Amino acid sequence: MGKVHRPRRGSLAFSPRKRAKSIVPRIRSWPKETEVRMLGFAGYKAGMTHILMIDDEPGLTNGKEIFMPVTIIETPPLRVFGIRAYRQGYLGLETATEVIVPDFELDNYVSKKAKGRKFTFYQLLKRRIATLPKNYTKDDFEQKLGNLEDMIKEGEIVEVRALVATQPWVIKLKKKPEVMEYAIGGTSVEEKFNYIKEKLGKELRVGEVLKEGELLDVIAVTKGKGTQGPVKRWGIKLRAHKDSKGRRKVGSIGPWHPARVMWTVPMAGQMGFHHRTELNKRLIAIGENGKLVIDGNEIEITPKGGFPHYGIVRSDFMMIAGSVPGAIKRIIRVRPAIRPPKKKPPVQRPQITYVSVESKQ
């Protein structure tokens, strides 16, 4: 229903509308789960396509074939490279210590420019974290890990999280990894620690962490659009045909008193490249090696001619219902839904009858 008084279409809750600090999105809140698993994953946005599927959610179209636009996010395996432990401080959680795995050689990355020379994980990680210890041996690692175990037994540590890095060289995107932190589900610090300890230095694939059919929250930095006027940025009305001094402006920027311009007045400025979270996106399916298995048949998810501005999907991928924020090739993070609806869809892959692989050019 329309409103008589409508100064803007955009929400002031997101003010100030400025550029995000980092292109790697942050996650400040985590769902509480008893299952021991990493609470989320990360990948790179490849593009969109559409599918036909049998609707398995309660409603008028239940059991019928429906059209569904989907986003493909390529998810090369994450590498767990450390543990971060927190103690309870006066103002909240404080970092108590970190344990980083010692350096090792990567089997899945060989530099063509360096005549086949293999890179170590540290060499690539240092492109993102300049403060990594230089002379860090296996003995140092085991000593730090033992100290952390003692702190957990004494009850000093209240939370442990996994430090992970993406591996974009696996999908031939770039060399510099993205580094981030993920919470772990579980009821005690000990079982969370044991889970991360087992995964340290190893790869973690999306199928080990997420389940087909579950609801996810998608966190990303939106497409940047630069400086835009108040009509596009805030959705204000165009002024009348014969209005003076411009049509795409606000009619008044405020009263005489208070003798200043309020921050709530819709003005021109930065639009896009904002940090945003979209809730309750369904994970339709998970594929491996760029292929989706449907009724025993393997289907290449890459459309004819490749995804525009992206190319070929080579690794594991997520198929998420609807659109997600962010530009092509941008890092996208997901976590299990923190505020799921009361009527949740079943946690299983819906029956997919058709996947569009026609050209998107």
UniProtKB/Swiss-Prot annotation:
One of its GO terms (biological process) is translation. PROSITE patterns: RIBOSOMAL_L3 (PS00474). Pfam families: Ribosomal_L3. InterPro entries: L3_arc_euk, Ribosomal_L3_dom_3_arc_sf, Ribosomal_uL3, Ribosomal_uL3_arc, Ribosomal_uL3_CS, Transl_B-barrel_sf. The keyword Ribosomal protein applies. One of its GO terms (cellular component) is cytosolic large ribosomal subunit. Residues 350-361 have a biased composition (Polar residues). GO terms for molecular function: rRNA binding; structural constituent of ribosome. Keywords: Ribonucleoprotein, Ribosomal protein, RNA-binding, rRNA-binding. PANTHER family: 60S RIBOSOMAL PROTEIN L3-RELATED, LARGE RIBOSOMAL SUBUNIT PROTEIN UL3. One of the primary rRNA binding proteins, it binds directly near the 3'-end of the 23S rRNA, where it nucleates assembly of the 50S subunit. NCBIfam families: L3_arch, PRK04231.1. Part of the 50S ribosomal subunit. Forms a cluster with proteins L14 and L24e. Belongs to the universal ribosomal protein uL3 family. This is Large ribosomal subunit protein uL3. The gene is rpl3.
